[in-house]
Amino acid sequence: MASTLQVSSRKCKNCGSTDFVRDISNTTNELICKVCGLVTEENSIVSEVTFGEASNGAAVIQGAFVSANQAHPTFMSHSGQNALMSRETTLNNARRKLKAVSYALNIPEYVTDAAFQWYRLALSNNFVQGRKSQNVIAACLYIACRKERTHHMLIDFSSRLQVSVYSIGATFLKLAKKLQIVKLPLADPSLFIQHFAEKLELGDKKIKVIRDAVKLAQTMSRDWMYEGRRPAGIAGACLLLACRMNNLRRTHSEIVAISHVAEETLQQRLNEFKNTTSAKLSVKEFRDDETEVNEGERSAESKPPSFDKNRLKEKKIKDSLDTKEMLETSEEAVSRNPILTQVLGAQELSSKEVLYYLKKLSERRKAEFSRIKATHGIDGEDLHKTEKDKKRSLDEIDGYSLEKDPYRPRNLHLLPTTASLLSKVSDHPENLDDVDDAELDSHLLDEEASKLKERIWIDINGDYLIEQESKRLKQEADLASGNTSLRKKRSKRTNRNQSSASIVKVQVDGLPLDVSVDDADAVDVVAAGGVKNLLQKTTFSKKINYDAINGLFGQK
C-alpha cells in the first residue's frame, strides 16, 4: 500500500521530478520517486507528538523526548517510572550544589562547568557511591581550581561546607588516583597574595604591598623555598615582609587568621628567608635588583634550607668526635666506616638517633683500640689517660649524657620528700598546733565563743532534746517494771537431722515457751494447750463448748 503525494519543495536528485510516493506498508516509511524509483527518505524522524491507545483503552504518548543536554532518549519502564531518572537526578543535584558553593566562594562559572565534568567522570567510574556528596563536590571544584590556577584552597571549601579539611583532602587524593590525574599543576603562592591582601585592608598601599610580596615570592622560589612547603605559608610570609617594607604594622596573628597556617610555620619561613642572600639587602637595593629576579634562575650560591641544615648537623657530629682518631678527609671516613656513612647520608636525624649512632661508633673504636694494644703490647700511663679523655668526650655529646636521660630535671633533689612532709604532721587528732593556715585559724573558736555557741544551739534544739530524754526515761521504767512488748524471734533449727528430740514453740499467756519433748503424747498435750489458749483469746462463736476441747486428746 502506498500513498501518492507531490512535494514542490523537494526534487529528486536523479531525475529532478517532484512526484513522490510514500510506502506506508512497512516500518521504514520510505519516500520513493515515481519516475526513477530512487529512495530519497527512510526512517524519517518527526517532532510531532502522537498518541496511541493502550490495551486498557488509556491514551499514551508515542515517541521519546531528547533534550539539548541529553545523549539518549528517556524511556519508560513497565511500572511507568523513568529508567534514567536516578542518574539525571544525581547530576542535577550535583550541578545545583556546585553552583551554590561556587557562588559562595566567588568561583567563575567556567570553573564550575569544568568541575561538573569532573563530577560526571567520577560518577561514571562509580566513585560517588558510598561517599559524602559534599566531599566529592569539594574535591571536583578543587581540581578545577588547580587546573585553572585560581587562589582557592582546601581550607576555603572546608570552612564553607563545615567539613574536615583532612576528609576533603583524602577524597581529593583518591579522586585524582581514580581518574589518573597526574599532571595537576602546583599551586603558585603568588595567586594567594592578592587574595590575602584584600582581607588585610591595606588601603592605598595595597598595590605596592602586593608588588613587593610577589617579588619576595619569586625570590623565595629562586632560593629553593617552594618545594615541600605549603603555598599559603609562603604567601603569608611574603605578605608580612611586604607590609613591614611599606611601614604597615601587621602582626603574626593577623597573617595566620587569613592564611590558615600555624604561627610556627610562618616564623619558620621567615627564618629560612633570613639565611638567604636576598635577606641581607636593604629595601631600596631589593626593589632596584630587577635583573636577578627576572632571570628566574637559581644561582650557585643559593642552596635549599634542608641542605644547610644537614651540613650543620654533619659539622656538629664531626666536631664531637675525637679528631685524633678521625681520618684526614671526610670522604675516606665515609668510605671506611659504614656507621658514619649511615649517619652522614641520612637526610633527617633526631637527637636520639645521632646519639645512638655515636654510641655504636664509640664502642667499635674502643674495641679496635684494645685490639691494637693487645697486638703490639702497648701499655702505659699516656695511653690510659688518652683512653679516659676519649671516653669522657664520647660519653657527653652536645651536652647530653648517653647513660642518663637528658630530659630529666636536675633540681629534683631540692624538692621535699614524703618522709619530711609526714614528719611535720602531729599524731594527735585534736592537736592543731602544727597547722599553719590563716584561713583555718579564723574558724577556730576560743573557750568563751565556744560556750556561747553551745548555749545558742541548746536554745534552738531544746524541744528535741527534751523529747529524746523523755523517751529514754520511759524505756528505762518499762525495763524496770517488766512491761516489755519485745518478742523473741523464732530460732531456726540448729540440726535438721534430729529425730529423737524436737523443739516446739508455743505462745502461752503472751510469753514464748520452749518445750523439749521426747514422745508424741507430750507433743499432743502442748498442742491442745496451745489451741485452747488461742480459742480463749479470740472467741469465734458462743455455740462452741470450749471445755470439751480438753477431751479431744484424751484429757479429763
From Swiss-Prot:
Family, per entry: Belongs to the TFIIB family.
Compositional bias ranges of the Basic and acidic residues kind: 295-309
Ranges for region Interaction with TBP and with the Pol III subunit C34: 98-272
The name this protein goes by in its record: Transcription factor IIIB 70 kDa subunit
InterPro entries: BRF1_TBP-bd_dom, Cyclin-like_dom, Cyclin-like_sf, TFIIB, TFIIB_CS, TFIIB_cyclin, Znf_TFIIB
Native source organism of the sequence: Kluyveromyces lactis (strain ATCC 8585 / CBS 2359 / DSM 70799 / NBRC 1267 / NRRL Y-1140 / WM37)
Keywords: Activator, Metal-binding, Nucleus, Repeat, Transcription, Transcription regulation, Zinc, Zinc-finger
Chain positions covered by the region annotation Disordered: 287-309, 477-501
Zinc finger residue ranges, TFIIB-type: 8-41
Gene name, Swiss-Prot/TrEMBL: TDS4
